[in-house]
Amino acid sequence: MASDLLVSRVLAEKYAVYATQGNLNNHIGVPLTLLAMTRDTELGVVEMGASACGEIALLCAIAEPNFGLITNVGRAHLEGFGGVEGVRRGKGELYDYLAANGGRAFVRRDDGTLVKMAAERGNLAVELYDPAIADGVGHRLEGAFNRLNVAAAMAVGRYFGVDEERIRDAVAAYRPDNNRSQRRSTARNTLVVDCYNANPSSMQASLANFLGEESVGGKVAVLGDMLELGAWSAAEHRAAVEQALAGDVEQLWLVGTEFSAAWRAMGCGDERVRLFATCDEAAAALQASPFAGKFVLLKGSHGIGLERLIEWL
């Protein structure tokens, strides 16, 4: 996620920091991250990923964090967590560990779910912060929703005594990579590349941002399946299609079996939509009929591989 990367960049303005590399955020990646730290490391920023309850608890037992940050409780990995309530319980395992071990949590004061989760653990030390601290702070992350990630990084930086100007400079200098919240200009089109991961919450936010922007040459949304949604998959993919088509998209490309099934169930009644079972099929279509002068969104789960389309855009 973008928040851990921003936090590490901000803290690196004052401390020797080692942070999670790539997607090493599971029961294998977290130990590898810890082993890569040296005696000179002053602060470690460890991303913890999970797709089911119990996984964050395991990672906390491995990493033994002193501080914790949950940016939100979204509709991710619903199949493994068994619904949003399971996501809340699973992420709450970080607060459980911190409360039991004298740790401190950074909590966004305007997020009622997170505030309630923290309050439920009465002995948890909490550092509340206001997302308004990010107002007017320049950054290169695509999407207004990334203001929340900027605010989280600023709150952590302030707590650890990083100079305010250096915090702002670090945020402004951070260039997103790994296909997260990036805007790119190619020889033919302008792209918003956000296909490192996708879940219903992030899909909704990305589409809202994309549809809200002005475009001279027309908008093309290329959406890849959101994986690990289980029984919620059909409804969530349908909701994403409806959101996209309610906006000013010129074309909507749907890549993957889940989106294809959702569209067929909807009756296939819009000529703007094109279906592709795989990313390779979409790439072949792009090679045959390339876009030019378009504003293009690439949003989907990493497993779909939408990043492979970039060379043809």
Regions found by a protein language model. Give the residues of each.
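Phosphate-binding loop of NTP-binding sites
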Residues: 1-105, 109, 116-121, 157, ...
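Active-site beta-alpha connecting loops in nucleotide-dependent enzymes
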Residues: 177, 195-271
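Short SAM/SAH-binding signature in class I
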Residues: 43, 67, 152, 291-300
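Short acidic-hydrophobic, aromatic-tinged amphipathic segments that line or gate anion-handling sites
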Residues: 273-282
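Short amphipathic alpha-helix with an adjacent loop that forms part of the alpha/beta core around
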Residues: 61, 282-290
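ATP-dependent carboxylate/acyl-activation modules
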Residues: 178-180, 303, 307-308
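Glycine-rich phosphate-binding loop signature in dinucleotide/nucleotide-binding domains
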Residues: 37-40, 160, 213-217, 288-294
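Acidic, Mg2+-coordinating active-site environments of NTP-dependent enzymes
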Residues: 67-190, 217, 242-251, 260-272
